[in-house]
């Protein structure tokens, strides 16, 4: 079984609550029962810093409201579950938390920040083979 596990946080890469616990442990458990699983996650600075063996995979261009993004591949610490991080300076390289700014207010562009994996579906033909072979 092939699974693309899309999440906004996964422990130990980044954690704000219980979602990160599930998103960090469930892929590892599925991998243990021979699922071919990869995590797709926003490329927050903490994620990019904590990924094991991060490498550039590809650039996806012309995403609506987003422009271009880079896919960075690597692994989860300890479990070695494959990870793809969506790298975008405009979307994810910010002070504050993943969901809110340093004053606690939601980022105004959160729908685009967390909708980017959905926007990528229109570009699937550009990246399918690269993702499949990662």
Predicted regions and their residues:
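A conserved catalytic-core segment of Leloir-type glycosyltransferases
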Residues: 43-129
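N-terminal subdomain of nucleotide-sugar transferases
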Residues: 1-75
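Alpha/beta-hydrolase fold nucleophile elbow
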Residues: 132-134
């Amino acid at each position: 079984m092939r699974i693309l596990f899309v999440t906004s946080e996964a422990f130990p890469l980044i954690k704000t609550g219980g979602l990160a616990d599930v998103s960090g442990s469930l892929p590892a458990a599925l991998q243990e029962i021979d699922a071919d699983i990869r995590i797709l996650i926003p490329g927050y600075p903490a994620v990019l810093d904590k990924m094991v063996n991060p490498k550039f995979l590809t650039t996806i261009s012309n995403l609506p409201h987003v422009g271009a993004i880079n896919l960075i591949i690597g692994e989860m610490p300890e479990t070695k579950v494959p990870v793809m991080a969506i790298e975008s300076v405009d979307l994810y390289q910010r002070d504050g938390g993943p969901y809110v700014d340093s004053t606690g207010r939601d980022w105004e562009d959160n729908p685009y920040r967390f909708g980017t994996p959905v926007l990528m579906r229109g570009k699937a033909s550009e990246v399918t083979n690269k993702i499949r072979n990662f």
